[in-house]
């Protein structure tokens, strides 16, 4: 099992603070905020599949925004009353990594939710690398129907 120090060394200080201590990266600074390439986003800690570029949108909030996870079972929601606010925290199911928060002000045509996720909690897997990286089963997400 990976120690805290080993994890911090593998993913970096910011990703460690975000995923393990529920820190928040500064708005408009994350690698994936204004990034719209085709592929999937996985938990930087565990590699578990979380979000698809098909569900990513520009919310203008300063963090990557998604209308939904690839499958609802991939994330867990938790009440968060930190900083005097009432929010819903989003964590990855397997690793329990803090990802961000979910709000009910997303695009109505896509279900009305906005998953506001820290770039530091994510790793992007480009579509053309998904098979090589072990995510071939998710390629069908991008099949045209």
Curated annotation (Swiss-Prot):
<dbReference type="InterPro" id="IPR011057">
    <property type="entry name" value="Mss4-like_sf"/>
</dbReference>
<comment type="similarity">
    <text>Belongs to the MsrB Met sulfoxide reductase family.</text>
</comment>
<dbReference type="InterPro" id="IPR028427">
    <property type="entry name" value="Met_Sox_Rdtase_MsrB"/>
</dbReference>
<keyword id="KW-0560">Oxidoreductase</keyword>
<dbReference type="GO" id="GO:0006979">
    <property type="term" value="P:response to oxidative stress"/>
</dbReference>
<dbReference type="GO" id="GO:0033743">
    <property type="term" value="F:peptide-methionine (R)-S-oxide reductase activity"/>
</dbReference>
<protein>
    <recommendedName>
        <fullName>Peptide methionine sulfoxide reductase MsrB</fullName>
        <ecNumber>1.8.4.12</ecNumber>
    </recommendedName>
</protein>
<feature type="active site" description="Nucleophile">
    <location>
        <position position="116"/>
    </location>
</feature>
<feature type="domain" description="MsrB">
    <location>
        <begin position="4"/>
        <end position="127"/>
    </location>
</feature>
<dbReference type="GO" id="GO:0030091">
    <property type="term" value="P:protein repair"/>
</dbReference>
<dbReference type="Pfam" id="PF01641">
    <property type="entry name" value="SelR"/>
</dbReference>
<dbReference type="InterPro" id="IPR002579">
    <property type="entry name" value="Met_Sox_Rdtase_MsrB_dom"/>
</dbReference>
<dbReference type="GO" id="GO:0005737">
    <property type="term" value="C:cytoplasm"/>
</dbReference>
